[in-house]
């Protein structure tokens, strides 16, 4: 969608018309799930076609609650910020950053270097956002 909700909507609509057997669409841009949900609703496919993606809770609360989107994921920005600050502190203190480093933040307790990299760390700090928890996240 190139980070464009209208493009996500138009593309999803075209795909769903051309390939009616499609059961789900996963978006990677925060604009994909809302655009895809709009196409699903417009084509009368709510409850028949699944969509999920990334997105902010407050901006997507309605489409989660009405079932247009079942799940969104993202990193908690506060936790990600604390993890980055922890990593920066370790580096500034001269600590060696090794595979498995614990940054002391939930989801960032066992960081691993991305395949083939000694600079990019990956953790498990994903949040799963559903209609059941969307209002409790505060952002």
List the model feature ranges, each with a label.
Residues 1-63:
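Hydrophobic alpha-helical
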Residues 5-9, 56-60, 76-96:
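Hydrophobic alpha-helical segments within soluble ligand-binding/sensing domains
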Residues 20, 45, 68, 95-96:
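Residue-level recognition of short, well-ordered coil/turn positions
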Residues 43-44, 67, 137-138:
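Short glycine-centered helix-capping/turn motifs at secondary-structure transition points
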Residues 50, 70-71, 127:
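Conserved beta-strand segments of alpha/beta enzyme cores
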Residues 53, 73-74, 130:
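Structural signal for conserved beta-strand scaffold positions within catalytic alpha/beta enzyme cores
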Residues 66-78:
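Short beta-strand elements at the ligand-binding edges of bilobed clamshell
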Residues 87-139:
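Hinge/cleft segment of the Venus flytrap/periplasmic-binding protein
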């Amino acid at each position: 969608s190139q980070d464009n909700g209208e493009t996500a909507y138009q593309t999803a609509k075209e795909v769903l018309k051309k390939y009616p057997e499609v059961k789900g669409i996963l978006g990677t841009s925060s604009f994909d799930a809302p655009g895809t949900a709009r196409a699903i609703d417009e084509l009368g496919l709510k409850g028949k076609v699944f969509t999920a993606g990334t997105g902010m809770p407050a901006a997507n609360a309605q489409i989660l609650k009405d079932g247009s989107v079942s799940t969104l994921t993202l990193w908690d920005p506060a936790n990600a910020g604390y993890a980055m600050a922890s990593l920066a502190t370790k580096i500034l203190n001269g600590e060696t950053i090794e595979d498995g480093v614990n940054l002391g933040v939930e989801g960032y307790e066992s960081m691993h270097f991305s395949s083939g990299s000694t600079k990019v760390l990956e953790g498990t700090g994903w949040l799963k956002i559903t209609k059941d928890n969307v209002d409790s996240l505060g952002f």
